[in-house]
Curated annotation (Swiss-Prot):
The lineage of its organism: Bacteria, Pseudomonadati, Pseudomonadota, Gammaproteobacteria, Pseudomonadales. Its EC number is 3.5.3.3. It comes from Pseudomonas putida (Arthrobacter siderocapsulatus). This is Creatinase. It is an enzyme of class 3 (hydrolase). The keyword Hydrolase applies. GO terms for molecular function: creatinase activity. It holds the Pfam family Peptidase_M24. Keywords: Hydrolase. Homodimer.
Amino acid sequence: MQMPKTLRIRNGDKVRSTFSAQEYANRQARLRAHLAAENIDAAIFTSYHNINYYSDFLYCSFGRPYALVVTEDDVISISANIDGGQPWRRTVGTDNIVYTDWQRDNYFAAIQQALPKARRIGIEHDHLNLQNRDKLAARYPDAELVDVAAACMRMRMIKSAEEHVMIRHGARIADIGGAAVVEALGDQVPEYEVALHATQAMVRAIADTFEDVELMDTWTWFQSGINTDGAHNPVTTRKVNKGDILSLNCFPMIAGYYTALERTLFLDHCSDDHLRLWQVNVEVHEAGLKLIKPGARCSDIARELNEIFLKHDVLQYRTFGYGHSFGTLSHYYGREAGLELREDIDTVLEPGMVVSMEPMIMLPEGLPGAGGYREHDILIVNENGAENITKFPYGPEKNIIRK
């Protein structure tokens, strides 16, 4: 028996898409306008974020590649046989082609089936690895491969009204996760127990809010003591002690869309040294919230906030940029690097953008007030300023948790 290279699996009915049909039509139209302006015949996306953004399909790689082929007329997802009909059910597009494991590089055969020929093809330079780029080029020897990743990132940076609704729900659910952290927190309770409680609360809130939603990737980083020194440090078995500096980080993931709540906490009491540093970081946070508005330049915001840290002689303990964009992203895909509040980013804020304000300083072990301090709010930039959609309280008046 000759096993096929590709299949079409139409199993079940199409599911309800995350956004309206018009929303996806608008996204695909903007993409096609860019392709036409640059004389690009088709785009072959390979990243989680762009495939999700343009088709509502968020793949699970597990070592296999995926793609979305967009031409003037078609939007075709390319998925692995192991996923069955799920990619077809989710894809907002014209087709889904499944590649099998039976022959080497059937993935590229599926892409070529979706796009038999082209003179100029858009790819993602920041995602497609060298090996697969070479294999793709071999399939289209007469085609020029050009980057579309940067242009697509700029499209994603301006959020639609429907995306704003999604992000508002995410911010609300992140606050639910934060409340669950406080609920589970106690002396000698391990980090993982607190994190599990918060993640469960957020997953249930997502399920209560959305129909036909895929529940994947929601997580909590709850860090204590020395583990607060890195914003992305994993949850451990360390047990919380009274007087510990704590970092609450809740991340509800909804259809590939990221939101976050991050707060500094203390259990029972806070030393004078810790309190002083915490208040400095809150001062910067509050100043930053006022700077988010249309017309503000990312680099200027960063430099102005640096002056406050410098005034308190703690600028040397700052750890990363002051904020970043939101949308279809996670800890393993989708960073919109053109919209970050850093000294090396000169992007000007516009209505529709969604950014965080999240200053952090970290003092290493052995120094008075050692630990990592971070507050994180989400703001939607509008015509007149910005709306803070994070409601969870911050600062020493609210977040010294006494039980």
